[in-house]
């Protein structure tokens, strides 16, 4: 760090220069001697020694004072030497301080670095003469101080501090205003001059300077001694090589620098302190190269502790760089480097400072307090460290050593032998720090050699290049023994006796050089590798056995035996094998694939860039012309021939290069014709000449395919070649492209995109069928592709910009290739280059990759410039017509561009038309042939489904998985689709093998080699037990097997199994790439191959792989998508197969697998029919319900085993008999005679008789019998029949022959669902498991809930009864039931009754969920018209009552339905209503079309109708059923409400909900309740409710609770605000009530209440209670009016009447009633004037006839009273319209009042109050203020009128105040709606998702599992409603059964 002294760095330099000039030792005198200590006396000098100073960055050699000088003017020679030393010098300078002060070093690092840079700059720029003090003063305009120093001054001013104190006052006196910085600079310059002029330099300073000068000249430094400049060392004649006494490995190895530094600091008994001069220039004196060498050897500190270090002797690049970086550390011959600051801590100045041993501080002696006369001896800590208590801790080997007669040589060499790591007498290398024992060298040395000795590392020859990889190693012969040349000097007594001189063998490594081909591989010594590729060498050591050379690795895969035979026959092969092949180099790697490019060197010689076979492009290498490689000349000729062909004559082979080429001219490629020579529309009867020349022969159907493709090309029709897998689509495509080329139609280029795994196969086929094509495979990593782009795309060097980044190709550049083969991924990744080329033809293999037009592949490929497109696919219809449409859209977007139109066109016509029309569309575009048509003699294939039992271990895990996931499975817990999928995957794993779970895998017995123990592996899985028996028999019979599994981990287990069984096998999965994959296939298909099994993963093994040598396929676990399985077994059943193929599909009985297989079969049925998008897609569209059904399959039986304890002990397993059935049924059991007696659940007939399946030898033999009938999948055949019309390319499409037998085509079948299935099955197991877990976790035993198992068994029985009708489809109670019409307590009898009603229909199965009949979609048997009629009925009457089927609710269109079908449809309809999702979607989740259903409107209507119905029921028992007394039959009141309700047999009437048995249907009130209740109050606008997920829910109580909460946050003020808005709008706007309709929708509560109470449902809590804070007159009026009304009725009609709607005065209804009744009573026209009575009968009419059926109501004699008020208007023309409008408006008002009543009822029951700080309350306070102000100043108006002027003035002020208050209130009112807090959605209030709420509400009312706390406790929702909301008591349950029934009735 520079001090304030500007030129501080220059200060000591001049001081040192003087000393140097006097005492410098010349290079000649020094003579390059290193035995420095021989030339100096041993006695110590009086003063502490001051060692020469190396720069502060050089490492510390010991504690000593130091000064430094440097020569200002170096000779050129010296500068050269300096440069040389800098490049060769080492950075190895051991330091003591480094370790001790690591922390401080880090802090100082940045400072030092900056300082180093400054110094380097200084050095680089040459040495500048510092300015003198006079110059500085003159420059700054200061007065100089001319003071002559006397001798005394020179004696007294011995340090800078004293000098400064003396001179500073003098300068300040002359220059009073001198800045401090300039003062310090001048003082520095003065001190420098003073020191330079000091005549007394011969004393201590002189001694120190001499030492500095001498030491800087030498490199090996002795302990510091004062010498006189006169002493000149004499050169020695010859010297022995350097030796030293090392330390053994037992000695603690310290940092080498620390050890050496102590020796160097020990010139005296007392170690001198370290001194340093701040800021001394790091320029060093010149030194000879020899002197630098020991310094050089210090290179690598780490090398001391490691056996292998980079060569310190070679001037390698890395070392130069390193030296340059650390140049400052080695500049001075021998200083030391410390981390100390270079200025005094006290005065911040440089100079001679002493360094603290325990911290980085430094001090002047005079700056210490107290001052020190001289440096203290030994270790010294500064005042700061002493204060902090930090002490220097001595190290073990810091003890002072006794000094001998001569000084110890200072040494940087290793303390131990590099080979054996032991101490003793060591031979030291003169060029590096290595040390060796003589006997450890190879060969050993007999004695210490004379002169300079370099170690093996320094004499090791450099490598010829960079090593890319190590291929092999071997032992070499020992080196020849070392011959002793000169007699050695005396051996030191410590040397061990010499060993025998034989050398030891060394390792040699066979290496591949980077940038060179395998032809250049060679052997290198171990030491070379160790020195130049340390990391690679170490890694190789770590991974390989370094005692025994690796066995020979024949990379070609040949066995030793084969190799020997070939060597005997082929001497060239023998030579190559010995030199290359045995070391793992494949012969292909040394064969030229093709020459890519050429270049000329300066001499004009040509070099070729060669691509080697089977190696990627990034391993291309440049080779010279003359290298001897087989076929090299031919390939050169081919290269030049291709250039000539593409570029013309100019590009032919240069004449000077023509050598052997002349002989090869005849092989030149034939140029394609420029014009077409053959008409492509003419058919070939036999294959063309250019195919004959390849030696191949096309099958007749392939020739037909070629003709069809050429014809389509001529017509410009893009095509799909859809031949079945295995018919050679690849060959037909290649021959087609080749024909275009050879016949002159097109020269390319052609783009072929294929899956990566098949690209190698494409290459081979191109080589075979199109030899003249130049085919480039564009795959690989970035480097490889970069090489391809630069060399294979064009002949021009600059056609494409080089580098890894992809650029476009220049326009109109000659393309080099004919065909580019690439993968799907690179089409998108390297779009820039590929998209810039104009392609003559595009071929996409496995084109179903284009089935989604949203995929990137589709979009990118669509943007390419392509003349003609050809798609290849074996499965053109994988899932649905939508995918086929996308293929056609890709082919011809101008023709196929309207997806909706396409699908619609094929959705509404019958199948025959559809097929015909599709054929007309597809005919020109698609050709499809089947193996069955093409190869009449091709062996058949038989597919058998083999049902397998779970092993005991699998059963344990299967149960565990279900139990552990009970909460996710139990729909009440709200399990989602993802979690169900996860559970299903776990169960599939369990069916495969329990070891797929980490827990089981860890516990499994293992073999020493890490694989599983075979016997336990087999016993753990039922499938493996069967596989073991099957494989044994198959092997004996000579069959070969393919085993497919989806899971690669399962393939790992199968590998262990096959190893255990001793079978040889191959394996392919997603991780095995193209090359390795093809090799494995080739090995398996090779004649006489030993491999018996081939393991494949279903998806990776499904593409373009030919394994026709196998004849047995075992599908270990089925894929979700059946097409993947078909592709899998088509690997074996293809061209070349000459045996019958047996396919065994393993399916675990009664498990998810069995169900999945059935679902997969159903998907296959969709393949040839489905045209609805989305219905047939893959697992993505699995609904939660489908997943749930799959998971349930077989579980009951599994857990029944637990309960029954496997009761079937008396039955012994018998031999299974394979029943080979068609797989159409989905469950073909190659099964067994089965034990009978089990009755598994579900409707799967296959399983019903089955129990444990046991396979014995007889069963296995039967299973493997190949004479069984072929059972090709019928669905598959159907699909193929559908596509069969494309099998003959006659250019006109044949019509479909088949006729559809079945009238109804099943699209989708609804699954049966029991809501409580998991609850009953798993609850007990789950609780037990939780208890065990809690006990294990130390939570104590759970208190068991008392369960009455009798009840449970009854419930179970009931459940079974319910399911007895095939689990009737409408029992989807969990999500679809509605409680509006269900009354749980009395439900049992109702249930039995309904069961009796159902009996007749029980045997008749329900129609399928979705079917197509005559082109029209049916849903559960309801056609479009019936569905519309059902919806209209819902919109008219609300929810169907529970006994709707017996009432006349059923309209004419629905009367043909059975009750079972009707109920199922109601259930489905409600489920759809409650399904969340956008109304805009085309279908519901299960695929049923929405048909424009607006969920919000329907739910709103259901809600409104429910409120109306309940209000009428409330008063029905009083008012009867007739509006006028003369119509009433006798004693109508005597009838029960239920009877009263449906009176007119001709009119459909909803039955009273109170009567209904609990069935899974209804949802009316529930929905109403949920429907829009929450947000509507504040705004007059209707909003669709998010909380409407109401699914028909079976638990009345639950729903009530939830709903309550749901409504709970009402308040008076909100209501008041409603009044303000609504009262104004109620009559005027017909829409407004609609808005309110939604409110009722949310009020299920009342309904539910009806359900729970079988009596009249008067659930209206006292209105006044609700209005505590703001009592309204209306309420009292209401009661009074009712009383009056009652009296009048008695008088007038003796007819009792009661009706009220307690709207709390929030609507105008009561005001109207009051006025109307007053008028009616006063005039006596009780019937003629419309009032309360009419309103009641209007509502009753709506309940009977439906919503807004005004005319029907008026025509009904029961409601005659409604016509009375209009009699006087009959004569008017618009009489009817007027009457209907009035009724509609009046109904809206009633509707509004009903909504508010329901809200108030809930608010009252929940004791809700409004926060006094709420804006609404503030408005109330303002109103009171206005009233108060007005009343208190009433008298003013009289006085003012009386002429009182002061009163008049006051009156004006008061009026102003009132005006202000009123305007404020007006402003507040307008803001009020937005300020009133809206009720949050029910989901937010309950803190649950909509799904969770719905599933929670699915519990049945009597269900003991209802957990009330979840809904009852107010904590759940208290905080949602603000601070002042009070719930129904402290955590109590909202139970509406406890509420008062109906206080709003008059006449009691």
Swiss-Prot record:
Residues 1-136, 228-268, 281-336, 547-569, 1206-1250, 1349-1409, 1521-1566, 1595-1692 are annotated as: Disordered. Keywords: ATP-binding, Chromatin regulator, Chromosome, Differentiation, DNA-binding, Hydrolase, Metal-binding, Methylation, Neurogenesis, Nucleotide-binding, Nucleus, Phosphoprotein, Repeat, Spermatogenesis, Transcription, Transcription regulation, Tumor suppressor, Zinc, Zinc-finger. Expressed in brain regions enriched in neurons and not in regions rich in glial cells (at protein level). ATP-dependent chromatin-remodeling factor that binds DNA through histones and regulates gene transcription. May specifically recognize and bind trimethylated 'Lys-27' (H3K27me3) and non-methylated 'Lys-4' of histone H3. Acts as a component of the histone deacetylase NuRD complex which participates in the remodeling of chromatin. Plays a role in the development of the nervous system by activating the expression of genes promoting neuron terminal differentiation. The keyword Coiled coil does not apply. Disulfide bonds: none annotated. Its EC number is 3.6.4.-. Residues 95-114, 250-268, 319-328 have a biased composition (Basic residues). A motif (DEAH box) lies at residues 845-848. Belongs to the SNF2/RAD54 helicase family. It comes from Rattus norvegicus (Rat). Residues 495-552, 590-651 form the Chromo domain. The lineage of its organism: Eukaryota, Metazoa, Chordata, Craniata, Vertebrata. Residues 1026-1191 form the Helicase C-terminal domain. GO terms for biological process: cerebral cortex neuron differentiation; chromatin remodeling; negative regulation of cell population proliferation; negative regulation of transcription by RNA polymerase II; positive regulation of signal transduction by p53 class mediator; regulation of cell differentiation; regulation of transcription by RNA polymerase II; sperm DNA condensation. ATP binds at residues 723-730. Residues 559-569, 1598-1625, 1633-1650, 1657-1672 have a biased composition (Basic and acidic residues). The modification N5-methylglutamine is found at residue 1388. Pfam families: CHDCT2, CHDII_SANT-like, CHDNT, Chromo, DUF1087, Helicase_C, PHD, SNF2-rel_dom. GO terms for molecular function: ATP binding; ATP hydrolysis activity; ATP-dependent chromatin remodeler activity; chromatin binding; DNA binding; helicase activity; histone binding; histone deacetylase binding. A zinc finger (PHD-type) spans 341-388, 414-461. PANTHER family: CHROMODOMAIN-HELICASE-DNA-BINDING PROTEIN 3-RELATED-RELATED, CHROMODOMAIN-HELICASE-DNA-BINDING PROTEIN 5. The keyword Metal-binding applies. This is Chromodomain-helicase-DNA-binding protein 5. Component of the nucleosome remodeling and deacetylase (NuRD) repressor complex, composed of core proteins MTA1, MTA2, MTA3, RBBP4, RBBP7, HDAC1, HDAC2, MBD2, MBD3, and peripherally associated proteins CDK2AP1, CDK2AP2, GATAD2A, GATAD2B, CHD3, CHD4 and CHD5. The exact stoichiometry of the NuRD complex is unknown, and some subunits such as MBD2 and MBD3, GATAD2A and GATAD2B, and CHD3, CHD4 and CHD5 define mutually exclusive NuRD complexes. Interacts with HDAC2.
